[in-house]
Amino acid sequence: MSQQLSSQTPSNQDRIVGKHVFGNLYDIDDKLLMDKDLLEGLVLEAVKIAKMNLVEIKSWSFGGKKGGVSVIALVEESHIALHTWNEYKYATLDVYTCGVDSNPQAAFEFIVSNLKPKRHQMFFADRSSE
Amino acid sequence: MSQQLSSQTPSNQDRIVGKHVFGNLYDIDDKLLMDKDLLEGLVLEAVKIAKMNLVEIKSWSFGGKKGGVSVIALVEESHIALHTWNEYKYATLDVYTCGVDSNPQAAFEFIVSNLKPKRHQMFFADRSSE
């Protein structure tokens, strides 16, 4: 009986559980979106909130009208990516985590609550193996 | 008249055009999914096919049952992320590009055609500013 239940509901031990929360963040204070250190700090904190293990984090600044900041954190074995465009007061955020106990939505909401976009969207994609 | 049309259909010069193609790739030859150099080479070629400008590419190998390879390319100003789990013959792929002329779908399909998953999904998310 338990074996039958097990085959109907595969154990999370037997597959990769991938959770990807992503969205677009509109109308943000442009000064925040130029502050590479602040943005990297938010992503670092988000890694903890999502219950992920950080492997490496890196950030870059880009000049020009369509410039801004990119922060990418590699975690085991997925990523957080935050891209900003200060002239457009715009940012996009992807929080992709692995593991049944990870919480990408909490990490996404943490960054949103700090950047305070006037509008934003949040979507979920299942990145699990079969 | 042209001004009116312009306000109805905003010029792509006036906003960030972000295109994100992503999906899960099932049942891949596990030897391919352990070959960090091969996977990094595929992502580098995909950057060109998508008509993106590479800023930096990096790859990592992870051991253990849930290990594999991660390759992340930062491009101006978005990313390609390929994560693999060889024990599960599984990979996920995100090709997120900026610019009206970029072609993330061609890059996605290039990597799929090389990894030859028995099944895969492909989704599109609009990451453009308003």
Swiss-Prot record, chains A, B:
Disulfide bridge positions per record: none
Keywords: Autocatalytic cleavage, Decarboxylase, Lyase, Polyamine biosynthesis, Pyruvate, Schiff base, Zymogen
Positions where Pyruvic acid (Ser) occurs in the chain: 78
GO molecular function: arginine decarboxylase activity
Gene Ontology process terms (BP): arginine catabolic process; polyamine biosynthetic process
EC category name: lyase
Catalytic machinery residues: 78, 83, 98
Gene Ontology CC annotations of this record: cytosol
E.C. designation(s): 4.1.1.19
Pathway per the UniProt entry: Amine and polyamine biosynthesis; agmatine biosynthesis; agmatine from L-arginine: step 1/1
Pfam families, per the entry: AdoMet_dc
Site location (Cleavage (non-hydrolytic)): 77-78
PTM annotation: Is synthesized initially as an inactive proenzyme. Formation of the active enzyme involves a self-maturation process in which the active site pyruvoyl group is generated from an internal serine residue via an autocatalytic post-translational modification. Two non-identical subunits are generated from the proenzyme in this reaction, and the pyruvate is formed at the N-terminus of the alpha chain, which is derived from the carboxyl end of the proenzyme.
Cofactor note: Binds 1 pyruvoyl group covalently per subunit.
Assembly and binders: Heterooctamer of four alpha and four beta chains arranged as a tetramer of alpha/beta heterodimers.
Family, per entry: Belongs to the prokaryotic AdoMetDC family. Type 1 subfamily.
Protein name stated in the entry: Arginine decarboxylase proenzyme
